[in-house]
Amino acid sequence: LGQVYPGQMDSTFVPVRSHHYDPELTFDFCVNEPAWSNQAGIHSAFGSTDRLYFRKEVPVNHDNDLSSSYSTTVWRGERANAQILVWSSEALEQVRVSTQDLRSAEGNIIPKDRITFELVRYVLSNYPYAEKKAICGESPYKSGFLMPDRFETLDRFDLPSQTTRPVWMMVDVPRGTAPGTYK
């Protein structure tokens, strides 16, 4: 294979697909397999919405972008977005993400039905992450790359062993929401 990049896969295994929403491809490579050795159990963290996290890699805390909590400022009538990462060295079945109403100290509420989650699925790309010279047309890379990109409605999901799964969280703040800090 030569140089291995995060999300890289052997493109000779890629079947010709009829449309974009077919099941994910699953034959990507892990760049840092030893990192999984100290990842027993299930892990989760909020990650940066400006970073891509690869399925076969343990999330790395670059620039303190992984956190156990999420905080943002948002206007009434707007949407706040966050990325939740779930990873495990062991296979897990029926993983669910749930929430509760957000409440202010004054007793105001953002109802939990205004908080939604979508699974981030991986799609085939001609270029590795952060490639500065990506163009439409033929790629100089012989391999394809799986990039986290497509959102899919989330009820629950299975997490294969040594896998990271991003989940996109959206909080739609109602227009009539009273100002305050909601938790």
Protein language model regions, located:
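Mature N-terminal, pre-catalytic/accessory segment of carbohydrate-active enzymes
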Residues: L1-K183
